[in-house]
């Protein structure tokens, strides 16, 4: 189960990875970092916005509670990113900032711990996967082929965003955290739409939390490709706001998945409305500033 979640998260987040790495290579910090944080916020916007569309089903009331551990890891990584942006530390090892190193370590250790917990709870599932070798091989081949296409398109998206910022005078933070983030997060939104249409709230929440974890890792992976210091040291102060909002929306997601009942339609929709309004507010803030 955990392996599938990771694979799906990586697959849907490949555009963010290629965009941020490409932006790091060409020296555009705000697109590299803004794309990661902007994608996290847009993912929440997609999840809760689509929940409003499917509100009659009240899908969040039927979700499993095993997303809590993933949510805690997301909160911890968010705290690390906020600390990295606030401190602006210049300490690095081979062009890799201390914040990036901590993120990678926490991400890997966190996934190992979550995987071990899920193995204890779902040990019986192993029996169902013994004869699926051929299917897995075909899936991996398709995954690699699609990955190549995404790698090329993601790089083109980053270069286009950088050129747009230079030619129009628009803020690179706006382009990276809003425009590029929206474009690179389309696979996540489509995955959530499909899951909610099938009434599979667990897949939808798992996809978003898994993708958001990977989006934070994406920033850390992009760090060594930037050669003029560390991404965390050079990032725009506006990105701190995005990091804080992402932290708060993660808390809302964790609280919502714990609910079993809602008093009425409005109380059910209230968290989703809060997230949607918060995202719109962030967009307006970045545009005006």
Residue ranges and their predicted role:
Residues 1-289:
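Hydrophobic alpha-helical segments, chiefly the membrane-spanning helices
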